[in-house]
From Swiss-Prot:
Gene3D superfamilies: 3.30.1440.10. PANTHER family: UPF0201 PROTEIN TK1335. It comes from the Archaea. Belongs to the UPF0201 family. Signal peptide: none annotated. Pfam families: RNA_binding. This is UPF0201 protein Pisl_1658.
Amino acid sequence: MRIEAVVEVRFTEDRGKVLKALQNVFTPVSIEEKPSESGVLIVATCEGYTCLEKLRSAIWRQGIQDAARNVISKGIVSENTIIFSVNKQAAYVGVVSFVTETNESPLGPITFTVKTNNVRQFLDWLAPRTYRGRVYYEAPPPD
């Protein structure tokens, strides 16, 4: 599995705070910076599920598995790729809030692109189905 997280640091933002927001939900192995029209793009990458443990823990801690599953499943773009976004400001304080519309996050979201051999297993691991508030089936970590 390969994960890429992209977040924009606008000219009006503090780079350190944006990095903190990213690192509150993602543990990257490498970070690159690329210039953009309104600031700098931070592109963070990682191989394997462990870099998403913070995101998964936050989803479980907040008890939003079903909502997360609903939003993330709408981001399935192929049999091996999922794209979803979380609010950068919420991530800064350790909270997961999914972004479903382009303008929903005024300072821009953190956008994740996940490439995996088994999209369903990834979804079942990150945000499993629940029944009456309890996890129905917890899948093993994906490839």
